[in-house]
Structures are given as C-alpha cells and as structure tokens.
Amino acid sequence: MRIKVLNPEVVMKIAAGEVVSGPSSVVKELVENSLDAQADSITVEILDGGKSLIKVDDNGIGMEEEELELSILPHTTSKIFSIEDLYKLKTFGFRGEALSSISRVSRMKMTSKPPEKEVGTMLEILGGKIIEKKRVNSSNGTKIEIMDLFFNIPARRKFLKSDSAEGRYVTEIIEKFAFTNNINLTYIRDHKEIYKFSSDMDLITKCLKIYPELKRDDLIEIEHNDSLCKISGVISQPKVGRNNRTAQHFFVNNRYIKVASLYSVLETGYGEILEKSIHPYGIIFIEIPPDMVDVNVHPQKLEVKFTDEQMVASLLKKVVRESLKKNTHFTMEFINSNDTIDLNKKTSSFSVQNLYNKNESSQKVDFSQNPTNTDYFENTDEFFNNSEIEDLQEEQNHFDNSYKLYEPSKTFDFKGFEYQKNQTFTPVEKINSLEKLRILGIVAERYLVVEGEDKLLLVDFHAAHERYIYEILRENVYEKGGLTSDLLLTPVIIALDEVRKGIILENKDHLEKLGIKLEEDEKEIIVKGLPSLVKIDDAERLIFEIADDLRISNFDQQPNILDKNLATMACRAAVKTRDNPTGMETLLNTIFEKKLLTCPHGRPIMIQITFKTLDKYFGRI
C-alpha cells in the first residue's frame, strides 16, 4: 500500500514549518503574543541573527503554571472559542499554533508570572517536550528564550541565510512593530542596543529614527475618520522617495499586511506629481470593523481580504490626494478619485510625467574626454579574488525589482516598446559603424537631432552617455579586477537606516571593488573614496541605490549583481536633462563604432525616421 498515515511527529514538524520560516517569524509570533497579553514594555534580543538565541521579555498579564503547559500544545489559545470569533477578531493571534510550532523546532525556555502571583513558573522544552519545570522568582509578565532554532531539522537550518541577513529580517520586523504600537520597545542585536522606542514617541519621530535620511519637513501626516473606516499615518513629499517600495508599510487594525495593490493605490494618489521611478515613503494605518476584513487567508497572516475592496482603495487614494493638495505647492491634475481599483488584481509599478520644475543648475559635460584621464585602461592594479559576495540572497518576495539589466550576451528585444504601425519614428535595430553623421542640434534639452546618410535620428544623450560610461567601467572591472579610487578631501558622512547600513557593511569588500572606500561610524557611514573613472556628484544617493540593488538581488534571477551596480553608477555619473554637453561627436562616434543600441537597463538609445518616409509623408514620392 503506497498511501500511509504520517507519523504525528512528522506532521507536527511539517506544520511548524508553515509558521516558523526563520528567526524573524519567531520574533513576529512572540511579540504578537506579548501585545495580546497587554504588554506595554517589550525587550527583544537576538544573537547570531537569531540562530543561537531569540529572547522576548514582556510585562504582560503572564500565565499560571497550568496555562504555561497548555500554551505549547497545538491549537490551544485564549483568543477565540468559535468560528464566529474570527469575524470579530481584535487580537494578533488566534490559531494556537505559534508556541507549539516554535517549541518543536528549538530548545525553549519559558518563564511567566501573573501580577497576582508571588512566584512564577519556568519550563524548559526540548523539541516540543517539557524536560524541566520549577517555580522561580521572576518579574510580572513572560520571558521566552529560543535557542538553537531548527536544531532537530538540519535540512531546514541549512537553508537559513547568513547571520547578518537573518538579523536584518528581524530588524525589519521590529521596525514594523515600532510603527504600529505605542509601547516601550527595546531591540538588542549581538549585545548592542539597536533601537529603543518609548511609548510617548509620535509616528514622525519614529520615522526619523528608523529612516535617518529623512527630515521632519519631508513628511506629511494624513488623517480620515468616518463610521466605517479610519485612515491615518504619514506619507512623504512628492520629491522624497526611494527607487523601490521598501519604505511603504500598511497596517490593517494594527496588523502589518502585504496587499500588493495597496502600493499602487498609494502611488496613484500622487497622480502626475510623482517623479518617474520614485516610490514615496508611506506608513499607512487602516482601521476597519473586524467583520469587514478576513485575516485568516495566509499561514503567517500577512495577507487579508476586504469585504469592500473598492471602498478601501478609493478612500485611501482620496485621503492621499487631499493631504498632498493641502501640504504641497504642486499643480494637482488627477483622474477621478472614484475610479474603480480592484485590490485583488495583481499590479505592477508605474511611472507618470513630472509636472513641476526642478531648480537644478545646468552643468557643462564634455563627452570628448574619457571619464577621467586618457590612460584609464592602465591605471588599475587591483584584482578580484574569487570568493562569492556573501548575503546577496533572495529578498524578492519582500521587494519588487523595477527594471531588468542589460545583458551583453543577448540581443535587445524591442517588443517591450509598443510602436504602432502608423508611427513614423521606429527603433534603431542595426547600426552601420561607417555611416557619416552630422549633429544638427539639441531639442527638449535631452535629445540630439542627428542627420545620417538616409535617415534622421533622435538620440537620448543621457542613455547614450550612460552606456558609454558603463562599458568603460565594466571593462576595467572584468579585465583589470576593479576600479581605482580617489580619496576625498572632505569625506561624505551618510546617515543610513539599520537595514541599508547592515547591507553596506556586509559588502564592504564588494564596494571597494567598485572604487568606493568607506568606514563605519557609530551612527553613520563615512565615504572616504570614490571611483577615479567617473564623477559622482551625489555619493549619498549612489550608496542608497547600491544598497537597494544588493537588498533585492538574487543570484538565480540576477546572475551578476556587479553589472547592476555598475549600471547604477553609470546612471548617476551620466549627463542629465538640462546639462550643457560638449564633445557630442565623440560620444556619438563611440556609440556607432561599438554598435550600442540600448542603455545598461535596456532602454533604446535612439530612434529613426528615413528620408524616404519623410518624402512619402510630404507627397514627394
């Protein structure tokens, strides 16, 4: 007989794997239990990314001896007693799975005492079985220590990421709890206090603590309250954001959720004043009657379903727009705020036209010169070692990747760009390196108008310059082992959030290969050297973007994170709209000589219209 009943121990370990994916999920479950126990002071401590130790200590209502023993049994809970209770839920937990699952895959120590008791109870549990029980002197509340996570499931333990990566995931969880609860919350990692939030700290102060790159004026408070739904929180000014959505967080009834469509609803609220590729900061709280939202649709309770998705979406968009109108000086041109949005529909990021003027000074850029001196092929003597870059593992389930990097071995596919049959300009799919060219001028402060032998070309000079720089950087990295650095006369001091800072420090050697030399200060990163081959005007933004590239990278999906970082560097160094470029002939000749069709991110460098097409248009033939 091939079908057999699984051993109960196997069943429990499989079930535990649904709840406990790693140290961060353990921290999430334990802190939620503390909050459900009415704690207003919680301390979380981890060692080695939570692999060796996770300790959560609270001052909640505690548990008596009998309750403590029951709490580690499967499906035991104080939160619900009937299926109807699911639809009026006001607690984080309800399934009675967390402590049972955690206890079965770790060495656990639990100490708890209700305020009315003189002494507490301590249990030691090994793989789900109580091995010691005794009465102890303890403070009010509950302290749970988790040691050697997955010690009895080696296959699961080996899939944990590095200590630093797992520690980052825990840090992200702590930040979300800090946003949503007015409690005293302390977070200690490897004996170092990372965060200490007090119960009287307002949301903007928390944002500034978690995201030190922000200033108070960068944030706008939002508020709406009616009989069915309350929306509150903070969003950022339209010109303040990241190149991904890692600073957008949504909470429904104080529970952190990941509903993909809400991200697009937030950005739709900005309309056309949101700069292309900028994703705003947003800490959004939605309070709704419990019977209008189902939280029992995901093993880790990260997804929810609304009974009226359209009401929530329209209201959120309206609140964002009204707050922006009140707090910004931009011309607001929005579509109808009552347009329908399906929260269950999978969405992708979008970009909109920028309607405001940037007060950027024009700078002169000379394309006729190499990024620095003419002997750039000889001035690098550092070589890579063959060790892999650590910790650039998958975080794609947390963040979306906004573009696909150009791959030198592949031909660019123009199918992604939609050109109607009756359009006169078409993408350039083939380049004749011997063609004679004549530059006629610049239009719209960003396009070269070029006369070819049988055609007229429009060239995006930012895309062209970006690809030109990328090729030089890539040649130096792959043929000479890395980029040389120029030491800065005045080091750049950068305030980074804990997650970005951790990523940068973990990959310090990787950044040195990119020509970036840095040191750690207690609160900041100090950049002391930048690559010699390119001029970087905004080192802070470059560091932010490299950190984010590393954060969302995956070696399976993104074979070479180094190429992606070089593309980011080239983009930052390339000439921008409204700059005053010189040496355009040199740039154009290089593009044609090397037959470069796209920028490093895959966007076309030029489009064309043949003179024959023009003659037909004007009735000459």
UniProtKB/Swiss-Prot annotation:
Q: Which GO terms describe its biological process?
A: mismatch repair
- Cellular component GO terms, alphabetical: mismatch repair complex
Query: What Gene3D superfamilies does the entry give?
Result: 3.30.230.10, Histidine kinase-like ATPase, C-terminal domain, MutL, C-terminal domain, dimerisation subdomain, MutL, C-terminal domain, regulatory subdomain
Entries under PROSITE patterns matching the protein: DNA_MISMATCH_REPAIR_1
Q: Give the protein's recorded name.
A: DNA mismatch repair protein MutL
- Give the family from UniProt: Belongs to the DNA mismatch repair MutL/HexB family.
List the keywords (alphabetical).
Answer: DNA damage, DNA repair
The gene name reads mutL
Q: What does this protein do?
A: This protein is involved in the repair of mismatches in DNA. It is required for dam-dependent methyl-directed DNA mismatch repair. May act as a 'molecular matchmaker', a protein that promotes the formation of a stable complex between two or more DNA-binding proteins in an ATP-dependent manner without itself being part of a final effector complex.
Q: Which CDD domains match?
A: HATPase_MutL-MLH-PMS-like (cd16926), MutL_Trans (cd00782)
Looking up HAMAP family in the UniProt record yields: DNA_mis_repair
Which GO terms fall under molecular function for this chain's record? ATP binding; ATP hydrolysis activity; ATP-dependent DNA damage sensor activity; mismatched DNA binding
